[in-house]
């Protein structure tokens, strides 16, 4: 898949990406990132803080080809990911989830026959 505007990193801009479903391990890693940001104890978030929480989860589901996974921190994504590309990535994750759900439903129908 390809980003519209890309993510700047170093002296380049990166466009190719892959997404994956959030696993339990990924959720735990995202929660650790939220804690590292000092946001795990807060009850009310500013818009930027809420986006950092969302990006902690997104970072566990996203690979930008050419950028090391450990560089894709919530703060890095907040500072460098364009809104259009954020929407594109979240839609790709939603499509992947739907694909997996649909595959499970079609398998259930076959088994029921």
Model-derived regions, located:
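Short, surface-exposed, charged amphipathic helix/loop patches that serve as local interaction elements
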Residues: 1-113
């Amino acid at each position: 898949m390809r980003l519209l505007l890309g993510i700047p990193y170093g002296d380049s801009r990166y466009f190719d990406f892959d997404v994956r479903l959030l696993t339990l391990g990924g959720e735990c890693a995202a929660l650790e990132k939220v804690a590292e940001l000092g946001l795990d104890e807060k009850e009310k978030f500013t818009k930027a803080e809420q986006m950092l929480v969302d990006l902690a989860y997104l970072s566990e589901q996203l690979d930008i080809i050419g950028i090391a996974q450990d560089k894709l921190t919530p703060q890095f994504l907040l500072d460098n990911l364009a809104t259009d590309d954020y929407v594109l990535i979240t839609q790709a994750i939603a499509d992947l989830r739907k694909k997996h759900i649909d595959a499970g439903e079609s398998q259930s129908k076959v088994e029921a026959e």
